[in-house]
């Protein structure tokens, strides 16, 4: 699996959501991207979670904006007036992650937008697998674009990788925070989702996704045993 690499050419505006301070930027392919910076929040681990979570979702046939690697030149942002943003840009020199910007998309609202029980069950199954704590009624991290449901923002997934201690034990523990999932009340076909997705999400597919993680996002070389830990989990 090959992700495209493009260069950031224009910083448009910050998207002040959560602690990661993503931004809207334009790249040299003339497309706009939501940039996830390596210098923000949980750093490169959040970017790795974004990549793995987004590409697993795509492999399961969910709609996910294209994920690209974004190269940030060291001179970029020197004229930025906001010191916090200027610091963030300086700390994020090099390789970052971007999601194709879906212009005109609306934030999913369960009161306004309806999803069928099959889709709801499949999204809940995905987030239980990813241990994604960030798809709640307060922050759905889903968009409606051209009347279709899109999944975004998986940077809070795979939280086990912030501490490798006892990851084998964590892997078999129930994911209790799934109780807060925005679509859980509608997810009445979890067994069907489980049966279907287990056939699609093979070890080979997971290996292909984790192989796409560049060493540069890890600050150190990723050993093969470490790279395989998300697969084992």
Task: Please report, for each region that a protein language model flagged, where it lies by residue.
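Short helix/strand-capping connector loops at secondary-structure junctions
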Residues: 210-223
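Canonical protein kinase catalytic loop motif
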Residues: 136-138
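Conserved ATP-binding subdomain of kinase catalytic cores across diverse folds
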Residues: 2-110, 120-123, 129-133, 146-148, ...
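Catalytic-core segments of enzymes that bind and process phosphorylated/nucleotide-bearing substrates
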Residues: 141, 147-212
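Residue-level detector of conserved catalytic or cofactor/ligand-binding positions
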Residues: 220-233
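Helix-boundary and loop/linker segments of multi-pass membrane transporters
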Residues: 113-116
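Phosphate-binding glycine-rich loops and adjacent basic patches that engage nucleotide phosphates
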Residues: 10-20, 82-90, 168-173, 194-203, ...
